[in-house]
């Protein structure tokens, strides 16, 4: 059975394309594609593997299984899907949920168990500054990020989610 991603509308595709262009031009020392190890659900892994095969992208053993599954890194520590020349994601249309939701990230409230959303600080992510300053873009992106983050949280087992939530992200602040 062929796995399919939820349909995105043209406005969503345009917004993601604009974000992609901003990220590609990013010159900060921090890189979302360097050493971040985004979690991959079983469903997303199948989708990415199908995409790699369909597009004839020669990446063998694209994933690592430790406490959770994430994309393999190249010898420089970048995500194997990050094209070092173009600074683009070669699987942009099917990239991991947390990559789609960026610069929004998440944690869970230890008391309520509910997902809480955070945004990266502009000093490490120019896109975060653009998104946060434009309330309309922020709201649209929050809606998209909530869906993606809910999808990844629902798609991970408890052990994997616990491992991900241990990762410290000090350069963020909570969005109400």
Can you annotate each of these PLM segments?
Residues 1-176:
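Short loop/turn segments that flank or connect secondary-structure elements
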């Amino acid at each position: 059975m062929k796995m399919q991603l939820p349909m995105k509308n043209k406005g969503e595709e345009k917004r993601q394309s604009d974000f992609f262009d901003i990220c590609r031009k990013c010159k900060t020392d921090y890189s979302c594609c360097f050493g971040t190890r985004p979690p991959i659900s079983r469903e997303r892994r199948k989708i990415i593997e199908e995409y790699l095969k369909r597009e004839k992208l020669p990446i063998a053993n694209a994933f690592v299984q430790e406490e959770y599954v994430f994309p393999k890194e190249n010898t420089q520590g970048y995500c194997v899907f990050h094209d070092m020349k173009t600074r683009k994601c070669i699987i942009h249309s099917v990239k991991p949920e947390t990559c789609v939701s960026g610069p929004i990230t998440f944690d869970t409230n230890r008391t309520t168990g509910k997902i809480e959303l955070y945004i990266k600080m502009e000093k490490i992510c120019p896109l975060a500054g653009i998104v946060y300053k434009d309330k309309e873009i922020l709201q649209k992106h929050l809606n998209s990020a909530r869906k993606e983050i809910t999808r990844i949280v629902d798609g991970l087992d408890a052990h994997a989610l616990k491992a991900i939530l241990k990762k410290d992200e000090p350069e963020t602040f909570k969005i109400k």
